[in-house]
Swiss-Prot record:
Disulfide bonds: none annotated. PANTHER family: URONATE ISOMERASE. It comes from Xanthomonas oryzae pv. oryzae (strain KACC10331 / KXO85). Belongs to the metallo-dependent hydrolases superfamily. Uronate isomerase family. This is Uronate isomerase.
């Protein structure tokens, strides 16, 4: 069967109504080529430190992308067949080309999803491919992409510059020595790659490696991390180290948004239980909650912006987790409370202008009921953009519709891509810019905004807001 042409319509994601589409097109034209601010994500700093070529199409575009392989798995594709590493680091003996052929043969499963939008953008604009990916073009794609990746124009730093990225933030464990960030800074390359402090490994008592991570935390800092005060001093020390390597933010991926405000004596007693390995699930939750409030206190001193990404049931598929480990597409959104959960922290620090807490959600029902009213009141609180399962065009639109009335635009932080998939970053930002242009055009067409106001908001959302919110 003959493959069809791959094309990107210039008006994709803009309104169907001609008049509104014309307004959206004018707005989009003002922001389409603005530099990319990527204030939160999971790209590998080693890429930019070593500037080594990416290996092949499969290793770059398929293996790291859980958005893609979770959909393949849902259709009965064994993860071994596409080369996904197992929990022990080993892989099935599958040729990368064979894995790519499996992906191409099932590419139709992504139709209509944001992954298809992003990947088609990558194929068309980054690799200049003009036939759609399918079983018949699988080898053509694999050979073309893999060959391109060995050329100077496709080295990580060249792509960073080609993508017009002004700054990108990676996310590291408190145990990370940040050697790659130091190497980037010492290299003389002008690309700006900063880190972010993600203390989850030494904050979650229910993590299988918590005890070992805590021991490493103490060895790394020289603090007695088996005492509450020593544990807090270790965090302060590592936060300062991260800030010295460019960090402007912290990130916290907790099961819930719970916070607490315990007395020092209560916190010490709880910590004693935690380090003995005797914490109940309720005590583990209380410990995570107290640490969040302690992180807020530290932010008052060191200025690091807090990000909270709660409400995900991690590793829902137990047999898959046991075989392949974490981050294999089996994370599921949960109902999440914010009004009661955040109150202890907000009672303590929510009115202090030195604190900036950016809250995300996987529970869309909380947008208008809880999060927008909270962000529309507390000076310390901002709303992160539609996240993970909701960063599709429809999810971005729902986010704007449900938060605008109570939070406005200026209690949000613009867009962040939150991705491991480096080559998709321009596509993700382009989708967000198109959706925001369409949303603003509707307000102009309804005479709720003047076009010059909408233009200013569009520029703010695409560029100024993330820089300001993340102190970049």
């Amino acid at each position: 069967m003959r493959s069809s042409v791959l094309s990107l319509h210039p008006d994709r994601l803009l309104p169907a109504d001609p008049g509104t589409r014309a307004i959206a097109g004018r707005l989009y034209a003002q922001i389409a080529t603005l530099p990319i601010i990527s204030p939160h994500g999971h790209t590998d700093p080693a890429w930019f430190a070593t500037n080594a070529p990416f290996a092949d199409a499969t290793e770059l575009l398929l293996v790291p992308d859980h958005y893609v392989f979770r959909m393949l798995y849902s259709q009965g594709i064994d993860l071994d067949a596409i080369g996904i590493p197992r929990a022990d680091g080993m892989r099935a003996a599958v040729d990368p080309r064979a894995a790519w052929r499996v992906f191409a043969a099932h590419y139709t499963v992504l139709r209509g999803t944001p992954s298809a939008l992003w990947l088609n953008h990558v194929f068309h604009d980054v690799f200049d491919l003009r036939l759609r990916l399918d079983a018949g073009t699988a080898d053509h794609y694999y050979d073309h992409i893999t060959a391109a990746l060995q050329t100077p124009d496709f080295l990580p730093r060249a792509l960073f510059e080609r993508f017009n990225i002004e700054v990108i933030a990676t996310t590291e464990s408190p145990l990370d020595p940040l050697h790659h960030h130091a190497a980037i800074a010492a290299s003389g390359w002008q690309g700006r790659v900063v880190t972010a402090y993600r203390p989850d490994p030494v904050v979650d008592p229910e993590h299988a490696q918590f005890a070992g991570a805590l021991q490493q935390f103490g060895a790394l800092t020289g603090e007695d991390v088996l005492t509450w005060n020593g544990y807090l001093r270790a965090h302060r020390q590592r936060r300062a180290f991260f800030a010295a390597h460019g960090a402007t933010s912290t990130d916290h991926g907790h099961p819930s948004a719970a916070t607490a405000d315990l007395s020092p004596a209560q916190a010490q007693r709880l910590f004693d239980t935690v380090v003995r390995g005797a914490a109940t699930p309720e005590q583990a939750e209380l410990f995570r909650a107290q640490v969040l409030t302690e992180m807020a206190a530290m932010s008052l001193d060191d200025g690091l912006v807090m990000q909270l990404h709660p409400g995900c049931f991690r590793n829902h598929n137990r047999p898959l987790f046991e075989r392949y480990g974490r981050d294999k597409g089996a994370d599921i959104p949960m109902r999440t409370d914010y009004v009661h959960a955040l109150k202890p922290l907000l009672d303590r620090y929510g009115n202090d202008p030195r604190l900036r807490l950016i809250v995300f959600t996987l529970d869309e029902t909380s947008y208008s009921r809880e999060l927008a009213p909270l962000a529309g009141h507390y000076p310390s609180l901002l709303l992160g953009p539609a996240w993970w399962f909701h960063d599709a065009p429809e999810g971005m639109w729902r986010f704007r519709e449900q938060t605008l009335a109570s939070a406005g635009f200026y209690n949000t932080v613009g867009f962040n891509d939150d991705t491991r998939a480096f080559l998709s970053i321009p596509a993700r930002h382009d989708v967000a810019r198109r959706v925001d242009s369409a949303f603003l055009a509707k307000l102009v067409a309804e005479h709720r905004l003047e076009e010059d106001e909408a233009t200013e908001v569009a520029i703010d959302l695409a560029y100024r807001m993330p820089k300001r919110a993340y102190n970049l």
